[in-house]
Amino acid sequence: ATKSTRPEGASTWWAQGGIAVARQNPEPFQRDIETASSDTSDPAAVEVLTQHADAAVRDVLIDTLNVDFDAGGDGAPYDYGREAAHSADRILHVDASTGKHIHEPFLAYLAEHPKVQIADGTAAVGLLAEEGRVRGARLASNGTIAPVYAGATVLATGGIGALYGHSTNPAGATGDGIAMAARAGADTADMEFVQFHPTVCIADGDPFLISEAVRGEGAVLRDAQGERFMPPVHADAELAPRDVVARAVERAHERTGQVVLDVSSFDFETTFPDLQALCESHGVDPSTGIPVVPAEHFLCGGIEVDTRGRSSLEGLYAVGECARTGVHGANRLASTSLLEGLVWGLRAGAAAPGHEQPAARSEEAVQTGDPPAPDTLQSAYDRIQAIMDEHVGLRRTPEGLARAQDALRTLAAEVEPHAAPDAPPVGHELQSACTVALLVAEAAAQNEVSVGCHYVTDPGDAGDPVAA
């Protein structure tokens, strides 16, 4: 079941850079993941990811879906790229639109599968849970909300980009799965670790990602005076971990008024034709520098799961960005999100059939009521985004986080009537956004240690952005 009716509604579609593999050498890959996380990732989870990476990509993406990854030079079958904080070339890619090229054949495969039914335009608005057990979900479609019973329920609902003013996520990324799981009593973890991508172009007000692969190819960041600012900040300069680069970009933007990505050191149009076309469609000429700012990109936390995707509730699984597997810790290494979703998806898929199908109850379907007025919805989202941008963004203060919690609790109370049992999906979606925003703010307030994506500072502090 997916609330979207378009492939672009899935986060996978939007992934650009690529998918990392171990190349038969998982130990250095594991070290890179742990280093990028400031040694906050779960070593057992990282080991699962790196040990299963090659087989998962080969068996599913290459042998089953026939994803045509870019070839290397001199007849090499693959062009392995390198991105920030990777110590080796290990990233498979298709131009700079890898997610789309994975997602399209995946949907085609599912469409032909005799045991898969895709219900699009169908939103999950709540879980059927009691006594620590999930028995299915309540699904809304065509003006009706009805229970669907299942031995296992797998959440793969993506991220939380809609909670921020600028994001690289699809518009529907309101954290629905995390909110439903939390309301049902599932454990969440690491919710304060919201990763901001350092290079997002919003030239015409419509954000679009400039892949990390561009910096891996040699692009550099310059301020409004044309000066590079990353070399003094970190030894790896533009290829430092994302949290470091994002804060440095924000500082440089505040200091000089603009930051551009200079791609003049290589043939950008030939190397990244999809990105060239995307820039041109937004009125940006890459040859003169691509204006960039940080924007919300990825939630490293989520529904706490084990190495099989099992949550704290019996019968409930989570995979992908809505899950907190422990792989990322405080900061995600580039090009590991597609891999995490693939590996945990396979493992959850193998474990989920082991649950007994629950008996259906006599609960009846209900007709949905009228949705909130469009201006009511827009006003609520505007308030959520303003709160999160100001107080729960790249740099946070204890006072700001306290104000954010107060404001979000007030808003949640106002929104609650719009999420009644017979409310249409947009009301439940808004409630989910409020729920998850508050989870992020509360987790951030409880963690006084600056690490990775979570950077806490005193008001007015202008210290070194890599102090965390």
What is the predicted function of each stretch?
Residues 4-34, 38, 208-211:
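Conserved N-terminal glycine-rich FAD pyrophosphate-binding loop of Rossmann-like flavoproteins
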Residues 143-152, 311-315:
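Core beta-strand elements of the Rossmann-like FAD/NAD(P) dinucleotide-binding domain
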Residues 180, 186-288, 351:
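An anion/pyrophosphate-binding glycine-rich loop and adjacent beta-alpha core
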